Amino acid sequence: MIEDNKENKDHSLERGRATLIFSLKNEVGGLIKALKIFQEKHVNLLHIESRKSKRRNSEFEIFVDCDTNREQLNDIFHLLKSHTNVLSVTPPDNFTMKEEGMESVPWFPKKISDLDHCANRVLMYGSELDADHPGFKDNVYRKRRKYFADLAMSYKYGDPIPKVEFTEEEIKTWGTVFRELNKLYPTHACREYLKNLPLLSKYCGYREDNIPQLEDISNFLKERTGFSIRPVAGYLSPRDFLSGLAFRVFHCTQYVRHSSDPFYTPEPDTCHELLGHVPLLAEPSFAQFSQEIGLASLGASEEAVQKLATCYFFTVEFGLCKQDGQLRVFGAGLLSSISELKHVLSGHAKVKPFDPKITYKQECLITTFQDVYFVSESFEDAKEKMREFTKTIKRPFGVKYNPYTRSIQILKDAKSITNAMNELRHDLDVVSDALGKVSRQLSV
């Protein structure tokens, strides 16, 4: 009993980075009172930002990033509730789950609406830009970035994605990138990409003089592969980003790179997302490959998540495949970068066969060309290799996605596994019956 109490106490003192969003009336002293709660609980504030509430004109929303333990976070939540409207509390990744037999498992979303708890844990927010960013000294650009960040931070599951009126400068930047990349796609992009790009032009307004709206793209993808788009303010951690893929949700930025250098961006922007990722998210086999990496990440250790993220990086972002005896590109980072797209098929780039056991050890480079690129025989080949690799990830349970409820089934005991098998048995019966009918028709 003494050991159990000690274990519970240690559990409550686990530390991590948490985020809270709460609203305050626009009155003198309101913020000071709220921040005093953090001070009294000895919680270190890492970042704080305010924005005008979109719910009530008389209120402001406060975004707080802090270093805390479970006990402190619980106390702060209850104290804040007494005189603020707490809109969102996102616990750290390392705060473990409370379900029986899963005490050592990091928290992960169980239903699609749970993504509301992790989609705002961006590593950089709004107008925060590094000193070497092309838009660092451009106050107009920084203000615009904050506008896009606020849209994303206000988004909740089930909301329509707000339509954006892009500026003339943003459309011109997009148009420059769109025009130059489309010159390369016929000789560089894989056939699946080339098949889907015209459909996006037809149904989503992909044009040189128009930046497509995320809501239109999301609706298109839902019909094609069941994927949907969720706006995000910036970089997410690998765990948070991959968890979205498990639900066939792609976290997508909406801001445009700085106009001073349309062929370079140090971070994912709408040109990268819409031209690099979206055409292949409309491809069923590729969509399944992406989702399976996401499912493998749920509840996995930090080490395992990092391995999965590296494999994702060298496939979905910078992957190559073989088609008709030639190398073709399917990685979004390549398909949205004119210079690197030319480089990777120039004959000067180092290329190796994709093998997750080797690939996960490779360093990911962000601001330069990759030292090596990995080639798969096909999406199916990459998928099979990743399936074998994910079997090596230690997890005290299995997971299965339920597309009807858009939730995760945790397979951890005889009952849950039996239920999953019954569902599969029904699906197999349907396929078997169809095969029988086809066979009888052929024999007539």
UniProtKB/Swiss-Prot annotation:
<dbReference type="InterPro" id="IPR018301">
    <property type="entry name" value="ArAA_hydroxylase_Fe/CU_BS"/>
</dbReference>
<dbReference type="InterPro" id="IPR036329">
    <property type="entry name" value="Aro-AA_hydroxylase_C_sf"/>
</dbReference>
<dbReference type="GO" id="GO:0043005">
    <property type="term" value="C:neuron projection"/>
</dbReference>
<feature type="binding site">
    <location>
        <position position="235"/>
    </location>
    <ligand>
        <name>L-tryptophan</name>
    </ligand>
</feature>
<feature type="binding site">
    <location>
        <position position="336"/>
    </location>
    <ligand>
        <name>L-tryptophan</name>
    </ligand>
</feature>
<keyword id="KW-0479">Metal-binding</keyword>
<feature type="binding site">
    <location>
        <position position="366"/>
    </location>
    <ligand>
        <name>L-tryptophan</name>
    </ligand>
</feature>
<dbReference type="GO" id="GO:1900046">
    <property type="term" value="P:regulation of hemostasis"/>
</dbReference>
<keyword id="KW-0832">Ubl conjugation</keyword>
<dbReference type="GO" id="GO:0005506">
    <property type="term" value="F:iron ion binding"/>
</dbReference>
<keyword id="KW-0597">Phosphoprotein</keyword>
<dbReference type="InterPro" id="IPR036951">
    <property type="entry name" value="ArAA_hydroxylase_sf"/>
</dbReference>
<feature type="binding site">
    <location>
        <position position="317"/>
    </location>
    <ligand>
        <name>Fe cation</name>
    </ligand>
</feature>
<comment type="subunit">
    <text>Homotetramer. Interacts with DNAJC12.</text>
</comment>
<dbReference type="InterPro" id="IPR001273">
    <property type="entry name" value="ArAA_hydroxylase"/>
</dbReference>
<dbReference type="GO" id="GO:0004510">
    <property type="term" value="F:tryptophan 5-monooxygenase activity"/>
</dbReference>
<dbReference type="GO" id="GO:0002576">
    <property type="term" value="P:platelet degranulation"/>
</dbReference>
<dbReference type="InterPro" id="IPR045865">
    <property type="entry name" value="ACT-like_dom_sf"/>
</dbReference>
<comment type="pathway">
    <text>Aromatic compound metabolism; serotonin biosynthesis; serotonin from L-tryptophan: step 1/2.</text>
</comment>
<feature type="modified residue" description="Phosphoserine; by PKA">
    <location>
        <position position="58"/>
    </location>
</feature>
<keyword id="KW-0503">Monooxygenase</keyword>
<feature type="binding site">
    <location>
        <position position="272"/>
    </location>
    <ligand>
        <name>Fe cation</name>
    </ligand>
</feature>
<feature type="binding site">
    <location>
        <position position="265"/>
    </location>
    <ligand>
        <name>L-tryptophan</name>
    </ligand>
</feature>
<dbReference type="GO" id="GO:0009072">
    <property type="term" value="P:aromatic amino acid metabolic process"/>
</dbReference>
<dbReference type="InterPro" id="IPR002912">
    <property type="entry name" value="ACT_dom"/>
</dbReference>
<feature type="binding site">
    <location>
        <position position="257"/>
    </location>
    <ligand>
        <name>L-tryptophan</name>
    </ligand>
</feature>
<comment type="similarity">
    <text>Belongs to the biopterin-dependent aromatic amino acid hydroxylase family.</text>
</comment>
<dbReference type="InterPro" id="IPR019774">
    <property type="entry name" value="Aromatic-AA_hydroxylase_C"/>
</dbReference>
<feature type="binding site">
    <location>
        <position position="277"/>
    </location>
    <ligand>
        <name>Fe cation</name>
    </ligand>
</feature>
<keyword id="KW-0560">Oxidoreductase</keyword>
<dbReference type="GO" id="GO:0042427">
    <property type="term" value="P:serotonin biosynthetic process"/>
</dbReference>
<dbReference type="InterPro" id="IPR019773">
    <property type="entry name" value="Tyrosine_3-monooxygenase-like"/>
</dbReference>
<protein>
    <recommendedName>
        <fullName>Tryptophan 5-hydroxylase 1</fullName>
        <ecNumber>1.14.16.4</ecNumber>
    </recommendedName>
</protein>
<dbReference type="Pfam" id="PF00351">
    <property type="entry name" value="Biopterin_H"/>
</dbReference>
<keyword id="KW-0408">Iron</keyword>
<dbReference type="InterPro" id="IPR041904">
    <property type="entry name" value="TrpOH_cat"/>
</dbReference>
<dbReference type="InterPro" id="IPR005963">
    <property type="entry name" value="Trp_5_mOase"/>
</dbReference>
<comment type="function">
    <text>Oxidizes L-tryptophan to 5-hydroxy-l-tryptophan in the rate-determining step of serotonin biosynthesis.</text>
</comment>
<dbReference type="Pfam" id="PF01842">
    <property type="entry name" value="ACT"/>
</dbReference>
<keyword id="KW-0724">Serotonin biosynthesis</keyword>
<feature type="domain" description="ACT">
    <location>
        <begin position="19"/>
        <end position="94"/>
    </location>
</feature>
